[in-house]
Each structure stands twice: as structure tokens, then as C-alpha cells.
């Protein structure tokens, strides 16, 4: 989960927002108005050189909210957001996000763009006056949030802040821009506009997949819809299909859906399990995986190897007293955990280890740590191997020092 910091708003606007947050949201999802951006913004993407990108770095606290650097196939992408002048004839301040890519080892500038509206991170979404604000926590999800990288590291997709909602408008009236950038050049591959509440997005290696709804959930009155936008044929019309499940991630070629969202910060001792459905982009089922506890960027899935044994042990542990729980220990079957990559049919045993989402030289990846005796009677976490989302899935043991103290 990406770290965020509070947004500092003008005092008058802050008081009005605190009052608004105390008011229950109606089922119609109608919202009153007090906006970070006065008026409706059109999409504007401007290329920047190195000097312009450096000059765009904000001096205010808004930049503190931006995501940690994202690893791509071409380098590290950083984002910073600041207030900029509005459009022609406007005296209002608007927010824009500067997206910049630098070479991983040398920090050499590669490209940068300025995007308006700004990228919709958790805090900015939370304080927006529209139906999307209730989904602010979803914007920080690493696999389906406002900033995601494709498994091959070639594309970066960004959900932008939706327009201000006027009094009387409903969730169906909400309009949100989503922009996909080529991570090598910074060029816009595709920009789309979706309607309704945006529940999440995910990238395969060839498509942008967006889940929207008419409520804060896909089932029932939410009337969830997944829309697929091709990134290889950008002139192609999007396709869509209805769903009552949550979009939780994507492999290289399939979507991953689940009955409910999983915790986004499960690194060890994960207990909530679900079954994830693998879907083709036409909505047909490609398979399923049970015992899933976490979905990671790049298509890696964390699961219990024996879901029934793991569930039985968890139930016994919950029913036991505190003293009884101290003497309980799971069987090998109940404790065995795996990382699975369906695209390459790769399964790796990680029993007794911990996984962390880390940028690796090829793009999104995972670091696997294990407790190791330090010689002083205690243990320390040491990197064991790292995984890429672009190769054959073999554990990498080279250059582990890059993860020390990181």
C-alpha cells in the first residue's frame, strides 16, 4: 500500500469538507459542491524537458501525497502534484501532476509530462466533491489503484481526478479520465473517459481494463461493468461485460476477479482467503485459483497450497483460548504457502518466508525475505530472492544487495 500524507486545504474549504464528511451519503450518491478545482477541466497533457520538469517540482505539501517511485521496463517513474494556473481567462488554481522517468542506475532524465486533471491518489480523491471520494482507499491499491504498471513494464496507466459533481447529479453522471503512457517515451498510448464510480483498473500487456459501477460496489444496485480498451489497436472500440465481482488485478493476458477485495497490506500471516477467477477480455472464464490471500502487481498471486487445511487450522486457532493458542501449531499442509504466476504456470514455495512488493530492474516485482539468525540470539530479515513479472518466473539471487535496508 502506498503511503500518503494529509492534504492541506484552505481553512474555509476544510471546514466545509469536514461538515460534509459528517453527513451520510445518500443511495443516489448526490454530492454538494466545494471543489479543489473550480469548474470542469478538460484533459491536458504537455511534454516537458528536464529543466521544466525540475521547475515543476512543487514547494507545497501536495507533493508529499504522491506515490513512491514506480519501476518500469525503462526506468523509475516519479510523480509530483502542484497547483498551477487555470485555463485561459481563469483566475482559479488547478492541480496538475508531473510524471517523470529517469534511468534506474544513473538517474538520467528520460522524459516528463504534465497532466491535468491531477492523478487521483487516496488523499486527493478523499477530499474531492464527487461520488468517487468514497472510493479513496481503492486509489492506493498497488494492483488496481490510480497508478498501475503492466506486467511487462511497458505501460503506465493513471486514473485522474474526476470533474466536480453538481448538486442533483448522481454517480452515473460522474466522468473520469484515464491516461495510458508508454514508459519508454512518455507518449500517450490511449486516453479514455469512463462514467460512474471507478472501482479500479488493471493492465494486461495489451489492454487497459477498468471497472465502474453505479454504486460503491459491483454487485446488486452497483451494476458493475468492466470495460476493455486495447493498447495494441488504439483505434478499436472498447468492449465491456457486466460483473458482480471486484477487479483485483491482472496477469499478462487475463483479468483477475474476486467476490470481495483482499487486504492490500498482507505480507505475512495472511488469513483472509478467497477464490480468484481468471477471465479473458471477452468475459469468458479462463480458470480459477483458490486459497488466495493477496494479489501483487505483475500477476503474482499469494495463496495457501492447501486452502482447506489452512482454513481448518485458522478456525481451531480462533476457537482456542489464549493459552491453548500458544501450543497450537499448523501442520505442514496448513502452513504451506505459494506464489503463483498463472501466465507462465509457475509455482514457488514461500513457506516460512515473507513477500514484499518492490520495483525490480524489469518493472513490477517481488522481494522474498526470510528470518535469519544474526549470531546475537535474535533474527533479522534477509533477502532470499526476487521475482520479475516479465521473465520465466525463476527466483533471482543476483544483486540482492540492492534490497538491503530498503
Set out the residue ranges of the language-model regions.
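N-terminal "mature head" segments of proteins
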Residues: 21-142, 148, 377-379, 385-405
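Sec-dependent bacterial lipoprotein signal peptides
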Residues: 1-32
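Structural core positions within WD40/WD-like beta-propeller blades
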Residues: 77-80, 84-85, 150, 155-157, ...
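Hydrophilic extracytoplasmic domains
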Residues: 25, 36-39, 56-80, 296-406
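Repeated scaffold domains used in trafficking and secretory/extracellular systems
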Residues: 61-72, 118-129, 139-148, 193-206, ...
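Short, solvent-exposed loop/turn segments at conserved positions within beta-propeller repeat blades
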Residues: 90-95, 167-176, 216-224, 264-273, ...
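A short beta-strand motif characteristic of beta-propeller blades
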Residues: 52-61, 109-113, 130-137, 187-193, ...
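Short loop/turn segments that connect beta-strands within beta-propeller blades
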Residues: 104-106, 182-186, 230-234, 280-282, ...
Amino acid at each position: 500500500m502506498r503511503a500518503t500524507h494529509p492534504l492541506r486545504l484552505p481553512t474555509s474549504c476544510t471546514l466545509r469538507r469536514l461538515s460534509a464528511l459528517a453527513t451520510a451519503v445518500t443511495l443516489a450518491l448526490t454530492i454538494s459542491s466545494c471543489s479543489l478545482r473550480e469548474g470542469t477541466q478538460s484533459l491536458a497533457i504537455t511534454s516537458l524537458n528536464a529543466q521544466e520538469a525540475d521547475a515543476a517540482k512543487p514547494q507545497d505539501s501536495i507533493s508529499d501525497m504522491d506515490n513512491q517511485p514506480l519501476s518500469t521496463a525503462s526506468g523509475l517513474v516519479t510523480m509530483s502534484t502542484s497547483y498551477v494556473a487555470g485555463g485561459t481567462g481563469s483566475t482559479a488554481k488547478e492541480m496538475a501532476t508531473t510524471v517523470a522517468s529517469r534511468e534506474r542506475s544513473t538517474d538520467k532524465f528520460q522524459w516528463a509530462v504534465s497532466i491535468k486533471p491531477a492523478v487521483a491518489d487516496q488523499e486527493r480523491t478523499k477530499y474531492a466533491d464527487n461520488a468517487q471520494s468514497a472510493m479513496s482507499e481503492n486509489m492506493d491499491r498497488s494492483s488496481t489503484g490510480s497508478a498501475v504498471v503492466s506486467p511487462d513494464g511497458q505501460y503506465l496507466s493513471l486514473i485522474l481526478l474526476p470533474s466536480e459533481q453538481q448538486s442533483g447529479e448522481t454517480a452515473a453522471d460522474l466522468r473520469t479520465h484515464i491516461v495510458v503512457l508508454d514508459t519508454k517515451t512518455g507518449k500517450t498510448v490511449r486516453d479514455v473517459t469512463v462514467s460512474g464510480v471507478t472501482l479500479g483498473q488493471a493492465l494486461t500487456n495489451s489492454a487497459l481494463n477498468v471497472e465502474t459501477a453505479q454504486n460503491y460496489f459491483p454487485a446488486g444496485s452497483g451494476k458493475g461493468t468492466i470495460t476493455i480498451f486495447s493498447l495494441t489497436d488504439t483505434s478499436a472500440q472498447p468492449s465491456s461485460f457486466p460483473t458482480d465481482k471486484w477487479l483485483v488485478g491482472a496477469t499478462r493476458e487475463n483479468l483477475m476477479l474476486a467476490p470481495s477485495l483482499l487486504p492490500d497490506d498482507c505480507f505475512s500471516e495472511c488469513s483472509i482467503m478467497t477464490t480468484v477467477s481468471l477471465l479473458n477480455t471477452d468475459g469468458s472464464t479462463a480458470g480459477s485459483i483458490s486459497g488466495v490471500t493477496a494479489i501483487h502487481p505483475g500477476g503474482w498471486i499469494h495463496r495457501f497450497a492447501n486452502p482447506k487445511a489452512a482454513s481448518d487450522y485458522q478456525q481451531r486457532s480462533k476457537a482456542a483460548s489464549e493459552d491453548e493458542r500458544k501450543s497450537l501449531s499448523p501442520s505442514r499442509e496448513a502452513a504451506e504457502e505459494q506464489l503463483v504466476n498463472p501466465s507462465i504456470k509457475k509455482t514457488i514455495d514461500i513457506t516460512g518466508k515473507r513477500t514484499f512488493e518492490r520495483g525490480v530492474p524489469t518493472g513490477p516485482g517481488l522481494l522474498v525475505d526470510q528470518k535469519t539468525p544474526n549470531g546475537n540470539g535474535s533474527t533479522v530479515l534477509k533477502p532470499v530472492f526476487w521475482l520479475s513479472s516479465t521473465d520465466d518466473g525463476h527466483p533471482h539471487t543476483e544483486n540482492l544487495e540492492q534490497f538491503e535496508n530498503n
